[in-house]
Every structure is written in structure tokens, then in C-alpha cells.
Amino acid sequence: MNNKTEKKGQRIASDHISELAEGEVFVFGSNIQGAHGGGAAWYAYKNFGAEWGVGEGLTGRTYALPTMEGAASLQKAVERFTDCAAQHPELTFLVTAVGCGIAGYTPAQVAPLFKNAAALKNVYLPQCFVELL
């Protein structure tokens, strides 16, 4: 299992995460109600302990990031995620292409929100975000 790579100082999360190593956290897009009914949210719920009804934050071996409540809300949620990742250097956060599925955003819209998170050594972003930063 290799869920992450480093190339030229860039930390890249795998596009296909089926299991997690010790200390790895699966970061997925959610809705604020925590109804994890589809996409990566459903996968996180079924496989990594995301709690139904929790729409933001650490649960199980996951971090729920609400993406369905609008761009301004998403920006604030990413800021809170970045703060959480900074407070937990013992964890490795593997970010999926949050917001780019059911929520309907493009990587070009979401990637810039992760600029500060990308500077953290324990945050790995999807290739489609890294290419835009």
C-alpha cells in the first residue's frame, strides 16, 4: 500500500486509497449534515470509520470536509482543516479531490484553497490540485 508520493518537494496523495497505514487520515468531501451517501464520503463511512451525522472534522480514520454549502463556506472549512492538520503533526492527511465530484467544483476552483495546507509536511494533496498550486 502506497497512498502517497513525494516528487520535487510536492506531496501527492494517491487517486486510489483502499486501505490506510498507521497514522494516515482519509480526507473527503461531505455535506454539513454528515449524510455520507455517495462518492468518497460513502467510501469513508464504509471503510474508514467516518461517522454518519458528522459533516466536518476528524472521525474514525477520516476528516470530513463540507463541500456542499457554497464556496465561502468551503474556504472556511479548508482553513479549519489546515489548522487541524497543523495541530496534529503525528498524522498524515491524504486529501481526495474534495468538492470535485458531487459538489460540482473544478480542481481550478478548489486547489487554491489548499495553498496553506500544501505547505504542511503532513498534508498530501491529489495530483490535480498539486498541478495548479
Where do the protein language model's features map onto the residues?
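Macrodomain-like recognition of ADP-ribose-binding/processing modules
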Residues: 1-133
